[in-house]
Amino acid sequence: LEILAADATTWQAPDALDCIVLDAPCSAIGVLRRHPDIRLLRQSTDIAQTVALQQQILKNLWPQLKVGGTLLYITCSILKPENEQQMQAFFAEHANASELKIEADWGIEQAYGRQLLPTSGQGDGFYYCRIKKIA
C-alpha cells in the first residue's frame, strides 16, 4: 500500500494501479455547516471550473487503473454537477467502466453513486461512487 499526494491532473503511476481513491476537489458545499466561511470563499461561477478540474483528473487517472481495478470517487459536495452528473458523463464516455453499487443503509442511492446529505443526521454532505474497470 502506498499513499501519496500529487497533482492528479498530470501524475503518472510507474505501474498500473489496483485501486484509486479519488477525493476530488469540489465546492465543499457538503461541509458548509462546519465551515460557514465557504459562503464567502465560493462563487457560483466556481462550480463549472471545479467540474472541469474533476473531469481532467478522471481523464488522467482512469487509464492508469488495471482492468478489474476499482476507483472510488468521493466529494464533500451535495451539488449534482460535481457528483451524479459528473458520473453520468464519465460512464457515457467510458464503456469500460461499470458502477459497483454501494449497498448501505446510509445516504440516498442515486442513478450513479450514493449521496449523504447533511440533514440526514449522519454528519456532512458527501457523495460516493465506486467504479470497476471491466476492460
Regions found by a protein language model. Name each.
Residues 1-8:
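Conserved SAM-binding strand-loop segment of SAM-dependent methyltransferases
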Residues 9-10, 14-21, 25-27, 48, ...:
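C-terminal catalytic and target-recognition region of SAM-dependent MTase-like enzymes
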Residues 31-49:
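A mobile, often basic/glycine-rich helix-loop segment
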